[in-house]
Every structure is written in structure tokens, then in C-alpha cells.
Amino acid sequence: MTWPVKDFNYSDPVNDNDILYLRIPQNKLITTPVKAFMITQNIWVIPERFSSDTNPSLSKPPRPTSKYQSYYDPSYLSTDEQKDTFLKGIIKLFKRINERDIGKKLINYLVVGSPFMGDSSTPEDTFDFTRHTTNIAVEKFENGSWKVTNIITPSVLIFGPLPNILDYTASLTLQGQQSNPSFEGFGTLSILKVAPEFLLTFSDVTSNQSSAVLGKSIFCMDPVIALMHELTHSLHQLYGINIPSDKRIRPQVSEGFFSQDGPNVQFEELYTFGGLDVEIIPQIERSQLREKALGHYKDIAKRLNNINKTIPSSWISNIDKYKKIFSEKYNFDKDNTGNFVVNIDKFNSLYSDLTNVMSEVVYSSQYNVKNRTHYFSRHYLPVFANILDDNIYTIRDGFNLTNKGFNIENSGQNIERNPALQKLSSESVVDLFTKVCLRLTKNSRDDSTCIKVKNNRLPYVADKDSISQEIFENKIITDETNVQNYSDKFSLDESILDGQVPINPEIVDPLLPNVNMEPLNLPGEEIVFYDDITKYVDYLNSYYYLESQKLSNNVENITLTTSVEEALGYSNKIYTFLPSLAEKVNKGVQAGLFLNWANEVVEDFTTNIMKKDTLDKISDVSVIIPYIGPALNIGNSALRGNFNQAFATAGVAFLLEGFPEFTIPALGVFTFYSSIQEREKIIKTIENCLEQRVKRWKDSYQWMVSNWLSRITTQFNHINYQMYDSLSYQADAIKAKIDLEYKKYSGSDKENIKSQVENLKNSLDVKISEAMNNINKFIRECSVTYLFKNMLPKVIDELNKFDLRTKTELINLIDSHNIILVGEVDRLKAKVNESFENTMPFNIFSYTNNSLLKDIINEYFNSINDSKILSLQNKKNALVDTSGYNAEVRVGDNVQLNTIYTNDFKLSSSGDKIIVNLNNNILYSAIYENSSVSFWIKISKDLTNSHNEYTIINSIEQNSGWKLCIRNGNIEWILQDVNRKYKSLIFDYSESLSHTGYTNKWFFVTITNNIMGYMKLYINGELKQSQKIEDLDEVKLDKTIVFGIDENIDENQMLWIRDFNIFSKELSNEDINIVYEGQILRNVIKDYWGNPLKFDTEYYIINDNYIDRYIAPESNVLVLVQYPDRSKLYTGNPITIKSVSDKNPYSRILNGDNIILHMLYNSRKYMIIRDTDTIYATQGGECSQNCVYALKLQSNLGNYGIGIFSIKNIVSKNKYCSQIFSSFRENTMLLADIYKPWRFSFKNAYTPVAVTNYETKLLSTSSFWKFISRDPGWVE
């Protein structure tokens, strides 16, 4: 529904409808009622300034009152004309909000989000209509005084700005109560303070891309985004999910490190900004906030069911109306008794909308405007714009007017390109400064060496102690310990298109009868002043270096110097880190050749700033920018001065001024009640512990990502900002010198070359933009490298210690209860050992769906791709090398391509050969000294069980090189030198009885070689074996690689290989996992072998937790039956998967697809359905929150809801599984928990069931199902 936005003039008279006089006691500036305009339902605009200070003043204060930049103008909104402009400006912005679907939905949420009539102190059976958190008094001037005549219950009041015009806020109206309804689900009305004509500015310095035409620059925020940001705070307040102020990130402030003395950054702000910065809040805390909100909403639903009274009692006739209003607001359902209840799916959708979808990052993408990349982005001098002028700002385009070409690169927001964006007077701006002073001797301090740095020019680095430490606490595990799983990933399109917000909501009349509210006497707030900070340093740091590069005002004789000290001592000298530039600039114009001189100067500068270096010792980054060191004097005293050498020696941590060494505290231990004596409770405790172990790994990874985003990336981004400043200062000096020389130039061509001179100066900005792209790439690679190389190994090391302790405790628990657990001891120990066999991979995309972070990681991944010297891919049904080196690839006639996956090939008979001849241009050192080989392989059972040795990949000539062999279920990598001395790596991949092996399954093999160290063998990203190879003699590598099975005579002996790559670098463990994640195709559901699961194909189905049993019908109910022969996988009743949406026959099944399962039974097909009758966990029990349903067969193959399932991919190192969900009557359940005979009435078999409390089962292996297809590689 689109709510119309009404037009008003400030001079319009009060009308007892949508123009009223309201008394706002929170505003200490105005003690009389103020004129208010309802521009759309429940949203009022009051064109007045606002202050809650005890002694309010709009004048510029003597000292900063904000740690951010402040701007003061006491005359703003002092006239009716200005108030009219403000009113119409807000109206125009609301009309612009209504231009997009996301904006319409925002307004809709605000309109129907009236705060609850009451709070936690209100009796649970009562609506209280006298609360100041919901009501505003309406007054009229009668008989010489103001009198209250009515009330209104608005959602939002929009005032003009605070004394600091740049301080946009959305505050609450509280009555001195101890609790806060905005935190407790009830909600409160919201008061906004905004100034839409005054615009914050930011730079795109840290963005991934910028135009080579317009270059990087300073941009202003679109006022519609600034307003929507504050309205999102209002949403959180109205819906009672506002986050308390103690949930925040504190800045790290220390004597020896330069970071912002900034305010605490509230979680509320990070949610409202959205995007990448939300990931700073650890997942565990985000889940807790959601659970808290869910609990509050359940309490409110309970209240609604009990309410039968009102305050005042005369309003009792309104009970049903307000019950309807609040049930629509919270999206409650009614159960079969007519009571209001929370629908979990609807709650999740609403909560996701309010906390994820409604955010500044999403708004800016939907309105196609330029916006700051991070919440911590640096702000610059604000600007002013007349947004009422359609020649400047329109409802459709904002500042980026198409008719002026301002839509290109958002140049309408570019303060250098759009003359309508007027810079504010710096005299009215107040900044907080850090005074930096050079300590001349140990005890000597000289103020003449001090410089002043704006607080917002320092990086914001979070205090690590302000990031949740809960994962480091000890935890007691019982049979009742649950894992709460909630994903805050969201689909924007689904959110915009869904119909969750009521289409025709119940609406209250704007003007309501007076309810005689108690007077609200709120005390004013005391103004807090901040003082500048002084810090002493022992050397000229980056702030001194930047200061030395600034151009002084009114200097007539500019010279460049390569001495920082000299530049700091003389106003006419500018420091440059480019000696050749200083020489050319200082030489000046010779023999009247002005244009030649100017061209030489510009060319020297632009050539130097585009330089990049590569160092063989650095494998972490593709290039380095050598002049960053002399531009900013980065690094410690031992390494300062030689940036390249320092970087090669110390790595990326060398760039971090503060806290370069990442540390992780010891993880808390899991403990168990040793007194447990019930068999089922012990088993359940073990299962819960394994689930909690997985959660501990995920929480630890999330904690690491939070630290990286809030403590590391902010420091790296700060280098970007400083380098942009540095290059801009250099360009300013060059421009000023060109202007001075041009002013003195008296040549006859002076006027003719004027435009060329201007073009030269403009070209500096373009080249700075290109240089910044290189710098950004370098800095981003450094940041990601720090995550993967400095942080991840330490986290995994601590997790491995935690695993060792936990596994030991679990085995001890089983051993100490072996009598009670008779018959289950071996199975439980095997399950524990298997669970702890592999570490959980770190896939950063599991912790964020932010597009910017994905771009950064993909860029890092591309640097891995850049090192490929062979990459076999299928193009137009031919196997070719796509590495760029164009190796010759010859495929034998009998080789089958693209048999299972796009880039695979099948080898069977001895005549099947693929011969690859590498490009001769590949350097010897590049292919061997640091090299890696990776590929996916699938080896048939008969080839595995053979006792012969088969060479399957061979690159040995004249007794030297490498090869890959198979023998007795082992895969062996052999590296051999010219003297036939060799080293080998061996991995046993053969099938075990517990189905944990790799026979005939796809698995990922990586071998890395380093001639000065080790060669290593990885399987699915896990290091399995390493061997020193530095004692080998010379290894001559053949440029020919032959794929084939030597001496093969059995037609059932075959193998498949896909995605074969050779890299000219030693891939790290993190690199390998990135390649693995990029090739595993998680969106494609896999069968037991790792092949794509397909529709209209027969499968045998087994449960991962009960691999010794197959699924079969018994009395029309599905049960698990013991295998008569565990080596026979093709046992039982085959299942065919059918598509609900008529997908192409035999097409791949994707993650989340809806499916129907048909089972062949007694030569007839049946549909598997979920029974509609509940099986109770204890016979005769009641179905409450833990309903259990059996699976059964139905002869009718129609498309019925109880037979529709959705499927989700589960991939775990050496097994491919799926989870299956049942959707029926809006009650989503997971097929999980094999219910054992003693647990309910089915006495003779283990039975698969559907359970409603599926959130606690998502990590349980009893919910993992495997589909076994008849495969040529497994012949029975």
C-alpha cells in the first residue's frame, strides 16, 4: 500500500485534523505548543529547532560538544520562510521515498507501527492510553492561555536539527520509568531531529572501483538516505527492538597508538547502516538479540489474549480495535482457540526486514545513489544545497540529474562537479583535535614541534574487549542443551515483494479525546564538553609527513624538498617523496618553454605514482606500492626507510601501527554432569556436545571476522585515506607551482595554451584516481592476507586444542558409562572419532552475504588464479588450457569428456590417454621452486581394490620429474630427482565399513612443493602428509604430462578427473580452501558419490547416523532395516526424485528445490508423505512444541502438500549428504531424529520421522540423508 504524502504551506491554518498545535515538553528551546503537520498517516513534521539541554543555546560553543564534526548556525529555522522551506523539503523527501518499493514498505511499517498502549509496568490485562511514550497533547489557545483539548498517537515526529546541525538523531519519549519500552517489544513513538539541506560528505577512496574519467573525489550524502537512516532508528523504536546503549563497540584508546577518541559505536547504528559492518557484531550476539525480541513478542501476544481493561476505563470500547492494530503490527496468527500466537516464520521475516533489509546500504543501492562504503568512513567539510529547487534536486533522480549529465558516476553528488553543493564556512565548524608533539629528548618537550590532527582523521579501532567474549567461557552440556540456529541472510527481492505489511490496516483517527495525562517534567540534559588530546611521539610519524606535504596559503615561491624537517620548518617548502619530481619542479621554466616544463612535471608525477613492484619473497600480495613508505613513514624504527625490504621481512603486519600481533584467548571447556545414569540422556548429551562443538567452531570464526572488520580493516583503510591525502597534497603543490609559473610566463602563446594548462592540471586528478585503484588493491590484499595468514591459523590452533580436550572428555564419558551404554559404546566412540577427525573449513561467505566483502575475497581468489600455469577446462566439448599459457592438449579417441561435470574426463582402458605439452615460455624456477597441483578425482571400486600399481598422471622424463600412482587403495605422489632419488606422499582413500572412505567418491587433491622446504599432500583442504624435500638433488621437470591408467585390463577399473590445475606458487592452506570452496559447487545437491543429484533418477537412501541400515516400508510406514550385507549398497526399495515445478527431466537438483519422493514397492510406485497424525514421543503424551510425525507411503501420486519436501545441501569433507524439509499447513519440519523402538509404539524398527523443533536438529547427523545411485564405478 502506498500512503499519499500531502502538501502544506507553513502559513496554513490549524484545522483540527492534520495541522495542530502540539506541546513537546522534551524540547527545552520552546516552552509553548508548536505547529505540526501530518504529512502522511501518523507522521508529523514540526519545523522548529530542538534541544533537550538544561540551558539550551543554538550558538557555537566555546569547546567541542561532540567527538564528531559539528556545525552551528543559530539563525537556521528562525523565520517563517525558513520553516516553510524545511516543511516542504521534508515533504519532497517523503515523496522521493515513495518512489521506490523499499521506501513504500518503510513508510508502511512506520504507519502501522504504533507503539503498544502500555509497557512492562502495565497490568497484563490492561491497555494504558495515558502513556507519554505513545501520546502527544494537542492544545488550543483559548481565553488567553493554552489548554489541552485532545491527544494524538503518532509514530514519528520530525523536528528541525539540534544546536549541532549535523547531529541527526532519533530519540525517545520516556517518563522517567526504569524500563524502556523500545527495548522490550512494546515500542515508543520517535522524535527525529534532522536538517535535510545540510549534507555530510565522504570520499570514495576505499571503494573497489572508480572512474578513470572523473576520478576519486568527495561526495555528499543524498538527503533521502540520511532521512531514511533516522527513520530506520524510528522503526526499531516503534517495534520495540531498539538495541540498548550498552551493546556497543568501544574505541581502543592508548598512549602509544593513534586512534579516534571516538564515541562508542552502538550495535543499533551498525544494524541501521547495514552491509559489511553488521558483521562486526558477532553472530552469537545477533542471535541473542533476535531471541530476546522473539521472547518479547510472545509476551505481547499473551498480553493481547488477556486484555479486558483500559486506562481510562471510558476507552474500554476500543479494546478490539487496538487488538487488531497490534496483531497486524506484530504479524500475529491465531491458533485454533482464537488466541494470538507468534508465527516463527512470520516473525523471522519481520525481524529480518527491520534489522537487515531496512538499512542505509540497501537504501542507497535501491535509489542508485553514491554512499559511504563503511560506517567508519571518513567525513569531510559538510555542504549545503537547496533541495527544493528542481534544477538541483528532483524526486526521481535526487542530485544525479539526467538532463545535466549528473547521472554519470553520480557526479551530481560530487562536490567538485556540482556547483549547487556549497561548502559551509569553516568558521562555524567545530572539530575535536589530537595535538601531536615530537619529544626532542627523553624529558624534553617543545610545543613548536606540535601539529594538530582532527579527531576524525584518525582511524577508528575497536577495543577487543568490547567484542563478545562469550565463546571463551566454560559451558556445561546436558541432554537438554540446544543449538539455536538463525540466519540473518536475506533476499531483498523477496522482502520487497512479500505481502507482510497489512494492505488495509486498521487506522486510528488522528485526533483522539483527551485522557488527562500526568504532566511530563523531564529534567534537561547537561552539556558535555570535550578537550583536545595531546600525544608525544619519538619520531616524525605519518601525520607529520602529511603536514609537511600541505600547501600553505598565500605562498609566492613554492619549492619541493625531499626533507620532511625542512618542509616543516619553512612555509614555502613542500615535502615530496619523489626526488625526480622535486628536481623538475624546482628547475622551473627554462628558455620560455613553459608548456614543455609543465608537461615534464606532470608526466614525472603521474609516471612515478603508477609504479608497482613485485618481490619474489612475497607470495601474499600480487604487487606492492613502493612509495607508500616514504609518503607516510610507515613501519617500526628498525625497518623504516626501505619499504620493500621491510615488507618482505615483516609481511603485511608491518603496515599496522596498532596491535599487529593478533591473539586469541583460550577457549572455554565443555563439561558434563558425571551423575547422568539414564541411557538416552547420556546419548543425547553426547549428540548435543557434538552439535555444540560445531557451533563453537562457527562462533570462533565469526569472532575472528568481527575482530578483523573492527580492528584490522579500519587500520588498512586508514592507509588508503592517508595516501589519497598525500597524493592530493602533491597534486595541489604541482598545480600551485604551475599557476605561479604561468602567471610569470610572458610568452606570446600564453592565452593559446591556457586550456592545455587546465587539462594538464585536471589530468593529475585522473592519474591519482588510477594510482588509488592500485593502492586499494594492494591494501585490500594486505587486509585479506592478514585475515588468512595472521589470524586464521591462530584461531584454528586454539580450536584444535579445544577439540582435543573435548574429545577426551567425551570418550571418558562413554567409558565411565559403558555398562549403561552396552551395545552402543562402539558406535558412539566411532561417531565421536569421526566427528573430530576433520576441522571445520573456514568459508568466509558463510559469515556474510555482503557483496563488497565477497568482491574483496574474490579479488584475493583471482590472485590465486593469476598464478595458474595450466588449467584444463572444457570449452565447446574440447579440453583446453585456460591459464593463458595455451598448453597443447591432445585427447585420445576413447577418452570421454564432460561425463558428470563440465570440466571432467573419464579414463578406463589403457588406450585412454590425454597428453599435455606445457608452454616452453614457462620458467623452470616458476614451475618447480614454488608450485602446486590441484584436481578432483573419483576412483572406481575395482581400481581401488586392485593390488597392482597404476600410474595415472605422469610427468617424468629421463628419470626425473613427478607422477601420481594408485596402489592398494592408496594414492601416491612421487617426486624424483636426476639421480633417481625420490620422495613420496601417500594417502589411503579406500572405503571403510563406516562409509567414511573415498572409494568411488569425488575428493579434492592438492600437492604443494617448495624446494627449500616441504612437499605437502592435502585432501579436501586438509593437510594429510608432508615430507622434507630440500635434500633432493636437481629435479628436471618434463614439459609433458600424460593422463592415463597404465596396463589397465579390467573394464570396471576406471577413474574420473576434473578441474586439473598447476600453480606457479606454493598454495597456503587458506589458498587451498579458497580453491576448494570455489569448485565444490555447494548450490548443487550431491548424491553419495559426489555426483549431481538429478530428477527422475533412482536412488537408494540411507541415514548418515545409521549407515548399517537402509530405508524400507513396513505396514506402509517407512523404517530402517539392518543391511544383510554391509558391502552391498544397492539394497532396499529405490526412490525416484520428482520435480514439483516441472523442471527438465534428469536436470540437476539445486539447493532449496521442492521435490516429491516416489518409492518402488512391490513393483508399484508410491509417494512418500508425512503422516498427518502425530506420534507422541511417549505413548499417550501430548503434542506441544515437539510434535513427531512418521513417514508413510501413499498410492495416489498426485502433487499433495504433505508429499512436498524441500532439500538442502550438506557437504562435509568426505561425505555428501542432504537435509530434507517438509512443508505442510505452514508448519516447516525437518526429517530428522531416527526414533528408536523403545522411544514409542513402533517396537520392531528404527523409524525416520519429521519433527517440528527442527532448529535444534540442523547440525545433527541423524538429519543427514545420503542418496546412492547405481554408479559404473561401484559394481556389485
Swiss-Prot record:
Residues 458-547 are annotated as: Belt. Binds 1 zinc ion per subunit. Residues 443-862 are annotated as: Translocation domain (TD). Disulfide bonds join 437-450. Changing residue 1235 to W: Increased binding of heavy chain to synaptosomes, whole toxin has half neurotoxicity. The keyword Secreted applies. Residues 1235-1245 are annotated as: Ganglioside-binding loop. Keywords: Disulfide bond, Hydrolase, Lipid-binding, Metal-binding, Metalloprotease, Neurotoxin, Protease, Secreted, Toxin, Virulence, Zinc. One of its GO terms (molecular function) is ganglioside GT1b binding. Residues 863-1082 are annotated as: N-terminus of receptor binding domain (N-RBD), Hcn. InterPro entries: Bot/tetX_LC, Clostridium_toxin_transloc, ConA-like_dom_sf, Kunitz_inhibitor_STI-like_sf, Toxin_rcpt-bd_C, Toxin_rcpt-bd_N, Toxin_trans. Changing residue 1238 to A: Dramatically decreased binding of heavy chain (HC) to synaptosomes, whole toxin is dramatically less neurotoxic. Loss of HC binding to GD1b, GT1b, GD2 and synaptic vesicles, ganglioside-binding loop is disordered in crystal. The active site is at 230. It comes from the Viruses. Its cofactor is Zn(2+). It catalyses: Limited hydrolysis of proteins of the neuroexocytosis apparatus, synaptobrevins, SNAP25 or syntaxin. No detected action on small molecule substrates. Changing residue 1240 to W: Increased binding of heavy chain (HC) to synaptosomes, whole toxin is slightly less neurotoxic. Slightly greater than wild-type HC binding to GT1b. There are seven antigenically distinct forms of botulinum neurotoxin: Types A, B, C, D, E, F, and G; new subtypes are quite frequent. Types C and D can undergo domain swapping to create hybrid types. This is Botulinum neurotoxin type D. It comes from Clostridium botulinum D phage (Clostridium botulinum D bacteriophage). The lineage of its organism: Viruses, Duplodnaviria, Heunggongvirae, Uroviricota, Caudoviricetes.
